[in-house]
UniProtKB/Swiss-Prot annotation:
Keywords: Ribonucleoprotein, Ribosomal protein, RNA-binding, rRNA-binding. Belongs to the universal ribosomal protein uS19 family. The keyword Ribosomal protein applies. This is Small ribosomal subunit protein uS19. PROSITE patterns: RIBOSOMAL_S19. It comes from Ruegeria pomeroyi (strain ATCC 700808 / DSM 15171 / DSS-3). GO terms for cellular component: cytoplasm; small ribosomal subunit. One of its GO terms (molecular function) is structural constituent of ribosome. Protein S19 forms a complex with S13 that binds strongly to the 16S ribosomal RNA. InterPro entries: Ribosomal_uS19, Ribosomal_uS19_bac-type, Ribosomal_uS19_CS, Ribosomal_uS19_SF.
């Protein structure tokens, strides 16, 4: 179920503070965040966020297409190695 419209998008306060500080300084640096649940807002377009996936920070360059989605969607947490191959079939 999606979030109610009257509540507005959820963004952790520290993400807003860090984004405002980088915008104000004019530097193009990676903003490290741990909040995968925060929604991407229009004011984040053009910034680079390092979204934590449990092991490391994955750099995410925010574009206009990403507005309204969550940061966690762009930082996968699981590694897919493929299905195990059948060893008997490989030998033939």
């Amino acid at each position: 179920m999606s979030r109610s419209v009257w509540k507005g998008p959820f963004v952790d306060a520290y993400v807003l503070k860090k984004a405002a500080a980088v915008r104000e300084s004019g530097r193009n640096e990676v903003i490290k965040i741990w909040s995968r649940r925060s929604t991407i807002l229009p004011q984040f377009v053009g910034l680079t966020f390092g979204v934590y996936n449990g092991q490391k920070h994955i750099p995410v360059n925010v574009t206009e297409d990403m507005i309204g989605q969550k940061f966690g969607e762009y930082s996968p947490t699981r590694t897919y190695y493929g299905h195990a191959a059948d060893k008997k079939a490989k030998r033939k």
